[in-house]
A protein has these predicted regions:
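HIT superfamily nucleotide-processing domains
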Residues: 1-349
Length: 349
């Protein structure tokens, strides 16, 4: 039996680490010698748009909202959108998926397969033009999470909705088309390959050991402590063992929860605290970096997934994919997750 080690101390300049969920190998290339402080950006290059012409700052005259919150309370409206909104959900003007009454598949030349991209695309917009989520209060972040959950519960009832993706692109390098902070919700009629693989591996582990692999990892991380950057009663935020990028953070519930849409009020508050801590640390430690965060949760296709465990991934844009990453499909991180976590732990929430 292989000897277990509580601590991960790299002595060889590079190390391959296995992601237990995806079964992907990642490279921790510490031989490149980057210290945590090196990742901090001195000047952030962003496209500036004045609030006077920002479409989200002038939303009252443009969009038909699906959901409006004002200072923690859901509000109704008639005709005109009230000016005191703080978080709002609107349809995306440029959707990749469109609602349709039919879901059709076609085969071209007994070779290529197509289907119509049936679905819904929405934007979750916060009020302040210049405040990223890292600068919002815990209360304001909870309002965003309230919006995620409420829209999820509504969209999962729609026809041809089998998966709901919730994500946030912050900054130019992360693909944000508008500097005004906003998240996106997109529904799809199918389940992507990566999620199918995660579901398959999670189920196999559950069948073999009668335990959730995510719960097992959380227990190990709580004991080891070296990769933990924040912890409260309900949530754990870590730099994962097989980080796909420098300063990657995963936030997951300590309890076994397969379905994000079933999150309770208490859990939403705990998740808001974890998000605030993680995003604030990245903001301070990396100099307001561009980043993506996204939800991993069980599909809403009517099947049961008791072995899955929802979680959020935050990926700062600390490096770009080059030829090796694209060709070998293997990410390289130039800092140990343990050192990244140690650096972030020292920073305030």
């Amino acid at each position: 039996m292989e000897k277990q080690s509580k601590k991960s101390n790299l002595k060889f300049p590079s190390e391959l680490r296995l992601d237990l969920i995806s079964k992907d190998w990642v490279v921790i290339a510490t031989g490149r010698g980057k210290k945590p402080e090196v990742f901090k950006k001195e000047k952030k290059e962003e496209v500036k748009i004045s609030p006077k012409i920002c479409p989200f700052c002038n939303i009252e005259t443009q969009e038909l909202p699906l959901l409006i919150f004002s200072h923690g309370k859901k509000i109704s409206y008639k005709g005109k959108i009230p000016g005191n909104w703080t978080t709002i959900d609107i349809p995306n003007k440029f959707p990749a998926f469109l609602p349709h009454s039919k879901f059709e598949k076609k085969i071209e030349g007994n070779l290529y397969q197509t289907m119509n991209a049936v679905g819904f695309c929405e934007l979750v917009v916060t009020r302040d033009h210049d405040k990223s989520l890292a600068l919002l209060s815990i209360k304001d972040i909870k309002e965003v999470i309230d919006t995620y959950q409420e829209r999820y519960l509504d969209l999962m009832k729609k026809k041809f909705v089998n998966y709901i993706a919730i994500f946030h692109n912050q900054g130019l390098r992360a693909g944000a088309s508008q500097p005004h902070p906003h998240s996106q919700i997109i529904t799809t009629p199918l389940i992507d390959v990566d999620l199918n693989r995660a579901l398959f591996n999670s189920e196999n582990y559950y069948k073999k050991d009668k335990k959730c692999i995510y719960c097992q990892m959380n227990e190990w991380e709580k004991r080891a402590k070296e990769r933990v950057i924040f912890e409260n009663k309900d949530f754990l935020a870590i730099c994962p063992f097989a980080s796909k990028a420098a300063f990657e953070v995963i936030i997951s519930p300590k309890s076994h929860l397969p379905y994000f849409e079933k999150i309770t009020e208490k859990e939403k508050l705990g998740l808001s605290e974890a998000f605030k801590a993680a995003l604030s640390k990245l903001y301070t430690g990396l100099g307001d970096p561009s980043y993506n965060f996204y939800l991993h949760t069980a599909p809403c296709d009517g099947k049961k997934y008791p072995y899955y465990h929802w979680h959020w991934t935050i990926l700062p844009k600390t490096a770009a994919w080059a030829g090796f990453e694209m060709g070998a499909q293997m990410e390289i991180s130039t800092i140990e997750p343990e050192k990244a976590a140690e650096y972030l732990r020292k920073l305030g929430n």
